[in-house]
């Protein structure tokens, strides 16, 4: 399929992938891209984020909303610098323990940046796999079924590529209304 040309797609840098995923929470892709580009121009490394003052970071975030995302990322960047010697942890549980890092963000960053075979399940992926599997309701049990289906696909394949492909199909083909996946 045709994948979108996204500025953070051509990197394995866990910092750039992580900040892009944080920006994309509750924010549309077309809105987030200019913020991402400005952010990377101002803060090219995780260390540059960690040492920056909160007001400078919040000023750059202005217009994206959901400021807790930004503050959590800032807090997490300081923890990574102090506790992990500036290296973003490639262990799922350790990365998940950082402020603001949920299941999806951990799955996306670890699979794309480090090749860790862990699912990255967003709303698009849930919708896609639900439709393919005939799942009608996203109960806790059904979410676990979806997670296990994806885990079973992550063998002998680049997990980052698979996760991104599933997200793209969900975002561009298996859309909520008038989907092209039936």
Identify the role of each PLM range.
Residues 1-180:
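Catalytic cores of DNA base-excision repair glycosylases
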């Amino acid at each position: 399929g045709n994948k979108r040309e996204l500025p953070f797609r051509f990197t394995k840098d866990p910092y750039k992938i992580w900040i892009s995923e944080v920006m994309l929470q509750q924010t549309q892709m077309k809105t987030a891209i200019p913020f991402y580009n400005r952010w990377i121009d101002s803060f090219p490394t995780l260390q540059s984020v960690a040492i920056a003052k909160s007001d400078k970071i919040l000023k750059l975030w202005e217009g994206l909303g959901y400021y807790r995302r930004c503050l959590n990322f800032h807090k997490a960047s300081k923890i990574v610098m102090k506790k992990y010697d500036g290296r973003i942890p490639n262990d799922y549980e350790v990365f998940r323990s950082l402020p603001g890092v949920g299941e999806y963000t951990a799955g996306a960053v670890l699979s794309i940046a480090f090749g860790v075979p862990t699912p990255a399940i967003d709303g698009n992926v849930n919708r896609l796999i639900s439709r393919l599997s005939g799942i009608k309701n996203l109960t806790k049990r059904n979410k676990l079924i979806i997670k296990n289906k994806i885990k079973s696909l992550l063998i002998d394949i680049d997990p980052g590529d698979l996760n991104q492909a599933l997200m793209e199909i969900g975002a561009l083909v298996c859309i909520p209304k008038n989907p092209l996946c039936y």
